[in-house]
Amino acid sequence: MTILNADRWLYEQLTTDGQLSAALGGRVYMDIAPQGAQYPLAILTLVMAQQISNLFTDRVMDAETWQVAIWTDAPSYTDIEPIADRIREILHKASGAGVLATVYQEHQRMMERNGDKEYKAIILEFKIFTQ
């Protein structure tokens, strides 16, 4: 498994689900959304990857921490809560080619202001075990 396979797997999970496609309209991005992107949208970010080794320091697998941030420009979190719930439902305990397991860890909320405009996010954090 290469590092990019986890990226591709995660992106595929979020873009091939019918409910998420309807809610996000395909607006799932790696690291940053393009300027002028419509909301709501999801941004995937690799926070860190740590090698898990045996006693002989042979690589057994990698433990990758990923954040999925669902952003809105609406005045409340209400419209993105079902999206966050669906992402958690899809990813928690999921596996696939090169992905041994995915575990939901935590979430947080965040708000940013840019001029008069407010943006809100629900950020989900997952541990993805890859090999």
Give the positions of each predicted feature.
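Small/polar-rich, solvent-exposed N-terminal microdomains that initiate assembly or binding
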Residues: M1-D58, T78, D85, E89, ...
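Acidic-leaning, charged glycine-interspersed low-complexity segments
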Residues: T16, E89-Q131
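Solvent-exposed, well-ordered amphipathic alpha-helical segments
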Residues: L44-L46, D62, Y104-Q108
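Short, amphipathic alpha-helical segments
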Residues: T78-E81, K120
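Short, solvent-exposed beta-strand/turn "edge" segments of beta-rich domains on protein surfaces
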Residues: L55-M61, R113-K117
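Oligomerization/assembly interface segments of phage tail-like spikes and tubes
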Residues: R59-A74, K120-Q131
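Charge-dense, low-complexity intrinsically disordered segments
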Residues: M1, A74, T78, R113-D116
